[in-house]
Amino acid sequence: YNTEGILCPDCQGILKYEHNTYANLGAYICEGCGCKRPDLDYRLTELVELTNNRSRFVIDGQEYGIQIGGLYNIYNALAAVAIARFLGADSQLIKQGFDKSRAVFGRQETFHIGDKKCTLVLIKNPVGATQAIEMIKLAPYPFSLSVLLNANYADGIDTSWIWDADFEQITDMDIPEINAGGVRHSEIARRLRVTGYAAEKITETSSLEQVLKTIENQDCKHAYILATYTAMLEFRELLA
């Protein structure tokens, strides 16, 4: 898994990690040429709260909060803090900015299909997909899952990356049903069956309109939709 991510960018040797956050992120060093993670100017010093739709955390003594879930979005927030502080913004101004931030355009975008509360999450590579899966795993309620896989140029025509994403985690979640949809619905359905999730609970269709209708008629009151880029755009058009 992610073998490219553990190769030294200077000499292509194998990186060693003192600790690993996720994927290739963490405190690394190459024993061959000495390449290592640069010293940090800003760092997360405490994780106060992490849920599927929000988080609170401390960066160098200052607590911040964002209204979007997942560890990967805390990384995004850390980058925003570093840039804002570099440009001269104080912590209070940064907090105000975070307080106004909301999920947008397929990045944990929320909407209703009938009386079902739905969350749409873009996936496009194994690391991002795995982080999205870990984020939905934090949900404290049952939800249906739809995974929409297209293979247009904007998605990437090679869909083999789905085998490097950690879909196996779905077997630990309260998911009563799964919809496999999109142009490559058979491929993502096969990937989901391999996890050990009950095959009879996986519905497979190329029609995103049918996926929408299935969500509308499901018993579960919550739904997560993980979609590649063009599948996300097509699904959003159906909601207009």
Model-derived features with residue positions:
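Extended acidic/charged loop-beta regions that coordinate divalent cations
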Residues: 1-63
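Active-site beta-alpha connecting loops in nucleotide-dependent enzymes
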Residues: 1-6, 104, 122-204
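A conserved, hydrophobic alpha-helical segment in the catalytic core
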Residues: 25-39, 68-99
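Gly/charged, well-structured mid-domain segments that form the phosphate/adenylate-handling core
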Residues: 35, 50-52, 83-123
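Glycine/charged-rich beta-loop-alpha catalytic/anionic-binding loops adjacent to active sites
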Residues: 58-66, 111-116
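Residue-level signal for inorganic ion chemistry
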Residues: 76, 80, 178, 225
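Glycine-rich phosphate-binding loop signature in dinucleotide/nucleotide-binding domains
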Residues: 87, 138-142, 215-222
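A glycine-rich beta-strand to alpha-helix segment
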Residues: 208-240
